């Protein structure tokens, strides 16, 4: 038997107890552990299971299946990686009553966190280990890998937090990986390209693509060729997020900028450029070209606490009514969120929604099979997660029934359009009180996470229901560019059965207002002063800056001023001239 060995360091066999978001429970901007790991209601889980059924797959007791990567194969087989370094073939996972059989393909890898098939003419499989991208191949047909080829070396310093995620196959045949920053040392990027997305050619040449990543546990290229990466809440990351990544982008965490001066870097920002913080990231981006805010925020504790795998539904409807949308898993809360996207004035934005909760363990990997079903790879060691198990794998299948859901939210010049999976009851949909909209943001700073900031209401001024009942247009005031808008539609009922929405809340990140027709005039009769005060921006160059409100300021507003026009478009100055 002919063998080729990788150049992986000898520390590869070590098992490391690690965390995506270490010690988050101890940080001042974070909720308590009880809030972070709040269990979903049994009623919600049961309702979700009516439409998307969880099928836990029983694993033999002698296998610790900390599933970190899943690759569906022809013939209803799976190939999975584990955090402990094994790679297994699994048969029987697609059966109505699954009985799994396992065959070991490889072992001794260093915490591989993903696996893909090598595209022709290459053979075998690619895995991303901590210290390298490796190609595995069985050349003699005995079912075991006998080629372990180092395709590209990935710099590491030994920090437990230096994960390598991927690989993902690019449309041009290259491979991409994302690299965690280190944690707990004097620097979070002690070696090159930590906190970056990297492109790797088949010959092993590695090229930096984008910087500013913290713990990008999931990323994907869509059917349209756009790259999106999730990231975990932490220092410089106020909450979980999904960001559109292009060559030369910087998306927020400055540690990786230590290497932006290196040859081949497409990023122009340098560490010394990051002098403004303590404000919403979108505000800083207006002053500092090169900073790229998220396409969609994933509110912390609401849509997860450790966002992980990102996958597009490519089933063409085999998985339900959300074909073409993205699904984002969460390791801490053992759930999956859903994201719909749109491009407005050249910028990606969209809405995030709850989708499926109640899994047995934290989800770190997602894969969709040819029949449309998803497989979830699960693990909790060192990280903690909701659920009764410590590791495993599950299958998620659409039952064929369509729930009453918000299918997508799209932006309008003066509000939003909510599109539904089934027609809405017109009587409830026409009432403005059926909806509640508010806006908030997160602060961009080096502290660990951010509480929701600058929250303010966005009153619904008008509602227009489509003739077919499949959409509703809301006209709001007080919408803010760059803010997350929480859209609650708890008062709605379905036209058939008068059922409430399965998940009545959407979180829309409004990066740009679109052009188009308004259904309320810009010169509204009442202009409410709804913009919450924004804290003073901290700056390395600021000599004086207040950090606390004066002691004699109360918690309540002193006065609410409403401006209205008099005939002739003259303002009533009575409140302003005293």
Question: What is the predicted function of each stretch?
Answer:
Residues 478-483:
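Surface-exposed, short loops/turns at beta-strand junctions within beta-sandwich domains
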Residues 9-22:
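Bacterial N-terminal signal peptides
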Residues 494-531:
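Extended, polar beta-sheet/loop recognition surfaces of beta-rich domains
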Residues 473-477:
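Exposed aromatic-hydrophobic patches
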Residues 465-468:
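Blade-terminus and WD-like Trp-Asp/Gly-His loop motifs, strongest in beta-propeller folds
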Residues 418-462, 487-495, 504-507:
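Short, surface-exposed alpha-helix to beta-strand junction/turn motifs within ectodomains of secreted
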Residues 1-7:
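N-terminal secretory signal peptides that target proteins for export/translocation
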Residues 27-403, 407-415, 426, 470, ...:
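Beta-propeller domains with acidic blade repeats across secreted/periplasmic ectodomains
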């Amino acid at each position: 038997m002919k063998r080729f060995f990788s150049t992986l360091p000898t520390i590869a066999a070590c098992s490391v107890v690690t965390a995506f978001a270490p010690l988050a429970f101890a940080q001042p901007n974070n909720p308590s552990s009880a809030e972070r790991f709040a269990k979903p209601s049994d009623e919600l889980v049961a309702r979700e299971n009516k439409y998307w059924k969880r099928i836990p797959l029983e694993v033999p007791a002698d296998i610790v299946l900390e599933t970190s990567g899943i690759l569906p194969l022809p013939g209803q087989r799976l190939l999975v990686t584990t955090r402990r370094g094994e790679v297994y073939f699994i048969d029987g996972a697609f059966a109505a009553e699954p009985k799994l059989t396992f065959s070991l393909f490889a072992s001794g890898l260093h915490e591989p966190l993903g696996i893909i098939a090598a595209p022709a003419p290459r053979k075998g499989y690619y895995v991303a280990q901590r210290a390298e991208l490796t190609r595995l191949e069985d050349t003699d047909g005995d079912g075991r890998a006998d080629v372990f080829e180092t395709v590209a070396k990935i710099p590491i310093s030994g920090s437990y937090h230096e994960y390598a995620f991927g690989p993902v196959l690019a449309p041009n045949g290259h491979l991409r990986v994302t690299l965690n920053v280190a944690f707990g040392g004097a620097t979070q990027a002690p070696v090159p390209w930590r906190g970056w997305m990297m492109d790797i050619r088949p010959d092993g040449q590695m090229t930096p693509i984008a910087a500013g990543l913290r713990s990008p546990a999931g990323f994907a290229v869509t059917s349209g060729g756009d790259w999106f990466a999730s990231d975990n809440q932490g220092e410089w990351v106020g909450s979980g997020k999904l960001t559109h990544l292009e060559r030369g982008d910087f998306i927020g965490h400055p540690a990786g900028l230590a290497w932006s001066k290196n040859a081949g870097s497409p990023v122009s920002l340098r560490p010394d450029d990051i002098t403004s913080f303590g404000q919403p990231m979108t505000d800083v981006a207006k002053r500092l070209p090169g900073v790229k805010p998220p396409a969609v925020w994933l509110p912390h504790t609401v849509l997860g606490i450790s966002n992980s795998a990102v996958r597009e539904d490519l089933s063409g409807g085999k998985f339900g009514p959300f074909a073409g949308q993205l699904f984002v898993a969460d390791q801490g809360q053992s759930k999956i969120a859903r994201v719909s996207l749109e491009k407005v004035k050249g910028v990606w934005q969209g809405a995030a929604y709850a989708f499926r909760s109640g899994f047995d363990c934290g989800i770190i990997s997602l894969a969709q099979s040819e029949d449309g079903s998803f497989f979830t790879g699960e693990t909790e060691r060192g990280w903690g997660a909701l659920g009764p198990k410590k590791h495993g794998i599950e299958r998620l299948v659409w039952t064929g029934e369509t729930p009453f859901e918000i299918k997508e939210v799209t932006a309008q010049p003066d509000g939003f359009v909510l599109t539904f999976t089934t027609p809405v009851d017109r009587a409830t949909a026409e009432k403005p009180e059926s909806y509640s909209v508010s806006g908030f943001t997160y602060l961009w700073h080096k502290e660990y996470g951010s509480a929701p900031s600058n929250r303010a209401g966005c009153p619904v001024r008008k509602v227009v229901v489509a003739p077919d009942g499949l959409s509703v247009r809301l006209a709001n005031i007080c919408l803010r560019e760059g803010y997350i808008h929480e859209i609650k539609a708890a008062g709605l009922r379905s036209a058939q059965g008068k059922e409430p929405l399965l998940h009545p809340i959407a979180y829309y990140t409004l990066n740009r207002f679109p052009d188009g027709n308004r259904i309320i005039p810009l010169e509204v009769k009442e202009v409410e002063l709804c913009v919450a005060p924004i804290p003073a921006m901290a700056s390395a160059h600021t000599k004086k800056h207040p950090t606390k409100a004066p002691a004699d300021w109360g918690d309540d507003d002193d006065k609410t001023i409403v401006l209205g026009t008099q005939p002739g478009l003259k303002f009533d100055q009575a409140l302003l001239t005293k």
